[in-house]
Structures are given as structure tokens and as C-alpha cells.
Amino acid sequence: TRSAFPTEAKRHAAISQVRGQEMVDVFITLHDSQNTCRITALGGVIGARFTGLVTAQVPVAKLQAIAALDEVEQVSIAEMMESNVDTTRSVTSVNYVAEGLQHGLPANYDGKGVVFGIIDSGIDFNHAAFQDSLGNTRIKCVYMPADNSGTKVTIDGTVLPGSEFDSTRIASLTTDLASSAHGSHTAFIGAGSHCGQYSGMAPGADIVMCALGGKKNDVNIANSLKYITQYAKRVGKPCVISISLGTKQGPHDGTSKLCKIYEEMGKSDAVICLSAGNLGSYRRYIHHKFSGMNTATNPNIGSYVTGTQAGYTANFAIDTWSRSRSAVGIKYLLIDPDDNSIFYETGIMKAYTYHYIGPGMESKRGYNAFLSQYFSGKIGVWVTTESNGHIETYSEVSLKPLRSDVKAYKMAVQFYGADGVEFDSWVTSENAYSWHPQVGDYKFVNGSDSCSMNDNVTGKNTISVGNYVGRNRYMSLSGKEMYNSIYPEGSIYVQSSYGIAPNGESYPFVAAPGYFVVSAYNGY
């Protein structure tokens, strides 16, 4: 189960202190989603309930005990998400439908009578973009899972983490995350009011905001989905939810926890629109099928991980999924930049492995004495069988040189698997898979962007959205016209994520303007 992962893995949500106890956000897959008594007896706090699973906060010290309960199928620690996103209205014909009566349509379709839900962070709650012409807020309510200063939220008899703020308290709010403007930007595009010549797509909609702040993880997205859909049911209005958050890691076949929740909620509760991502043109993906048994000296695929010169600090993660119940092993190489020789190589790692590296780590099991002469950091590998029956090999690497004279060793990875085993692998940090000259028996291939979309879009009952160039010029705040002739108007933007997933589906389903879009900014 995912609970076997050490909580220090960077893919996972940070540990929180709740009444002096270390707690972590999780999904718990259950044989009976109502049978949670023993989980709460062990200190777990149940959040939103979905078919076959619940969200929860559980004590770190009780993770293994909860995972061992008979009624529990799997415990999955929350995983961090990443942010993905005038002329835009005209090129998408939004102006036409917003003024529908003038064009023979039965109504003006500007979002009136619809709940527009946004799940994001970096929201300026009192921006003019979210007010009507009289200066009154259009935000009906705000839910913040990381803020307990509002009113507690109870749904289906359980209390969600964090709190809510109704429209009478919006004026007292500032922002959930001053270091980001992403949520202000995406919310204005979706439902912003008329601000001069600019407007969002649905300026007549009722706005419900779920502001994640620094807790931008999949569990809090699930809690926010439940919050928005329950509000829409309560007021008796249809609901559209926009989410421009996602993750590069995951099976990309619609079976991850958040995909299944989207599938459930998208059946009848809401129209859910998801950003495909902004990783088109980045070579972060490898797909391969092994032919012939591999040995330690004769792998048949590998790649150089760009931007990972260990002498200048290497920090990246690799997420590899076998398409079967046969694990894919990995080996890391440090290549000398002067003569392309192998400076160091790990063994083949096909089970949980953890290298503790650096001064002060001598007492740790897994202490790597050789690398500790040069670096501090870690190499971690976790191998788990997931809910789709396939085996995930996830790895994190962090190497920081101890001295200025440590060479900038290049890092590469080699993959190992049995004959016929097929796998997909993504390098999940700001790196890429790249060709490199052969080193000994080790060969290296380029990665591609052919499966670059966010894992969350691969489920059912959602609309995946890519982006195209709606405009290639805009007026800067200083009054200077900015123009980029490289990207023609109407063309798919080069960084728009796309691909054919392992489940055979092509993504995204639609595209919207996503380059040089004028939108709101966080004033904080």
C-alpha cells in the first residue's frame, strides 16, 4: 500500500501538526466506505466520503496500523499537485452566446443560474474581477482546507478539514497564498466580471472558491469537489468546476484515486473541466517493451537525465509504471564529464531501497559510504502494487556536493525488466530524458512529449482542456505592445500537453486560448 512510503518522500503532502500530533492527509480505500469506526478509534479524522473510499487526516504514527485493518484495502498518502494555465472571448465565440438573444438564441448565456466552482491557490478574494458593478462580491462562499478561522463544514455527517466563509465574510479575507497569482488568473478567465474591455467567460455565474493555499494536494482537491457540489445541490443550480492543477506522476490510465473521484462526481454532480498541462515539447516520457532477458551488464534501455549534474546539486524524481504485475528495476549511473566513464553506479533496484548519503548518516541502515565522500542527500526507491494491478517503481534523487572541487557528474538511469514487460516512465521534476553517447555497454535514448498530459485528465466523465494561441500580441502595463511572431494565432501552443495514454485514449478533448491571456493578478 501507499502507506509503506516514507512520509519524507517529496511527492507527498507535508506533515501537519494538529493538537501537538503529526498528521498527514490520505485517501483510504475501504471495502465498506461507511465502516470507519476503527479508523477514528486510531486517531483518524474522516473527511469526505466517496464510493469505496474516504479522505482523512491520520496520525503518522498510526499509518501502518490503519493500513492493516481488515476493512482497509489501501492507504494512499496525499500527493502534491502543480499549477497548469478581450480576444479570448471573441475567438471562442463566447461573446456570441453571451449576447444570445441578439443572435436568435433562446437566452443570453453568461453563466447566470450556474454555480462556477474554482479549485486553486493564490486567490485575491476582493479583486474587482469578482465583484458586480456596485462593488458587491459575486463570491457566494469560500472553502479553505488549510484555514480554521471560519465556520466548520459538515457534509454527510463528517467534518471537512479547514473551514468556510460565506459572502458576508469575504471582505475580511485577503489571499490564501501571497506568493502565487494562479488562482486569481484562472478564476477570472472562467467567471470574472466585466473590467474595462476584459471579462471572464461566465460573468453572470455564482462563484464558489476553494482556495488550497500551501496545501495543494489531491486529498484537498477531493474535499473541495465535495464542498462545491454540495453547495450547488443545496441551492438547486447546475455546477461547472474548473481545476488547473495536476500531476506528472501516476499511471495515466484513469485509475488513480483522484481520477476515480472525478469519474464519480462527473456522472451527475458537475461538469468538471481539467487542464491537460503545460509540458508539451518537454522530453519527459519513455515508453518501452523489453525484448530478451536483461542482465546487470546488458540493459536494453536507459536515458541521461538532463539538468542533473550532481556537482551542482541533482534533485529529481522518476515515476515508472509496469503495464503488468512484473516490476521494472532501475539503476542510477554517475558519469564523469571529462572522459564519459562510469564514476559510480547503484545496483539494480526492484524493491524498496534507500541510500542515506552524507555526514551524520553513518548510523542509518542503507548508509552509502562511497557517495558520502562527495555528497549529502539521498537516493530512494519505492516499489508498490497499485489499484490497477500494475507495479509502480518510484524514485527520488537528491545529491548536493560537499565541496567545490566535486565534479559535475552527469546522472543517468537504466531500466531493467523481464522479456515482454512493457512500461511507461516520466521524469517528474524540471528535467528531461535525453540521448547520451554510449558508455561501456550502457546505451541512452531520447525521451518524448508524446504522453505529457496531467495524469488526472485520464479518467472518465471529465473534459480535458489543452491550449492554443488565441493572440500573439498584447499591451503591457507600460503601454508598450508586446508581440511574438513565433506562435501564429490559432495554432496549438507548443507547451500544451497531449498524448495517447496507456489506456488508449487521446488527450486533450478540447483546446482553449492559453497563450498571452490577459487576466487578473493577485494584489498581495
Predicted regions and their residues:
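Catalytic-core regions built around general acid/base machinery
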Residues: K257-D269
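Extracellular S/T/G-rich loop segment that most often corresponds to the catalytic His/Ser-adjacent loop
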Residues: Y143-G162, K267, R283-E392, V445-N446, ...
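Subtilisin-like serine protease catalytic core
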Residues: L101-N220, G236-K237, D269-V271, R283-R284, ...
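Mobile, glycine-rich extracellular loop/lid and propeptide segments
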Residues: I39-T40, F50-L69, F188-A191, S199-P203, ...
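Short acidic, glycine-rich surface-loop motifs adjacent to enzyme active sites
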Residues: A211, I228-D253, S275-A276, A412-G420
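Active-site core segment of subtilase-fold serine proteases
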Residues: A107, I123-S184, G200, D338-S434, ...
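Autoinhibitory N-terminal propeptides
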Residues: T1-P106, V115, A128, S303
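Hydrophobic beta-strand segments within beta-rich accessory/binding domains
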Residues: D25, N300-K331, P401, Y409-N431
